[in-house]
UniProtKB/Swiss-Prot annotation:
Name used for this protein in its record: Ethanolamine ammonia-lyase small subunit
Entry keywords, A to Z: Bacterial microcompartment, Cobalamin, Cobalt, Lyase
Biological role: Catalyzes the deamination of various vicinal amino-alcohols to oxo compounds. Allows this organism to utilize ethanolamine as the sole source of nitrogen and carbon in the presence of external vitamin B12.
Species annotation: Clostridium tetani (strain Massachusetts / E88)
Catalytic activity from the UniProt record: ethanolamine = acetaldehyde + NH4(+)
Gene expressing this chain: eutC
InterPro entries per the UniProt record, alphabetical: EutC, EutC_C, EutC_N
Lineage: Bacteria, Bacillati, Bacillota, Clostridia, Eubacteriales
Amino acid sequence: MFSESDLKRLVEEVLVEMTTKEGANIKDTPVSQPTPTVVDEDGIIPDITEVDIRTNLLVDNPENAEEYLKMKKHTPARIGVGKAGTRYKTETILRFRADHAAAQDAVFTDVDEKILEEMNLETIQTMCSSKDEFITRPDLGRKISKEELSKLSSYKKNAQVQIYVSDGLSSKAVEANVKNILPALIQGLEGYGISVGKPFFVKLGRVGAMDVISEEFGADVTCVLIGERPGLVTAESMSAYIAYKGTVGMPESRRTVVSNIHKGGTPAVEAGAYIADIIKLMLEKKASGLDLKL
């Protein structure tokens, strides 16, 4: 039998022994030094969006890789992306997120003012006061105040064709295409002997704003080069909406549209020449939209 004093002494001995061992372990254990982070200032992080989806096959051990690539060549759709177990591969997810981010940036950023200055495009703004209002109030994106229109009072009126550029839902579309499409379009029209009014830029503009421009300038044909709503395939797609004798409140069926103007669709220079041909036909037939037989 142990007495109470014996138990106390035993507990004290155990505690002393444990403390001695812990102290020895702390002294014997080397202190790990933090590893410095090495930053390669000359290193380049590859841009995943530069990879051509049509040639990038991510399926492991495909049954027929050649036929798979032939199919991918004809579409930018996300096929042949492969799986890691039941999940998408990391590269697939990163590309999806990168493309989605690019689409968001295209909507919420403004067109680079240096490009507008370089193209000598005077800027006016619709009745939208911000990007948020532009998204939530499309009706205001179709209206332009008299004060804004007065900025263009020195511009020639009643030309055969009035062209202008607008950001629409993609500022990136304007930045990527306007330098090529606008000169090609004007050159094509002037080559046909068609008079063209001086182009300008409408900020926060919807397609319907072209009707206000049509009435203000009195041109026979009005053409707006506007950024399309971006998607996961491209954020740089532009469209041309063209109308003969446009008026505020006219039906949408009176507009002719040339869409998918981007490097992966119709190239900007080619689109400019094609639009010039359409406008020439409009002036000859005095019609646009469904009334114009192309």
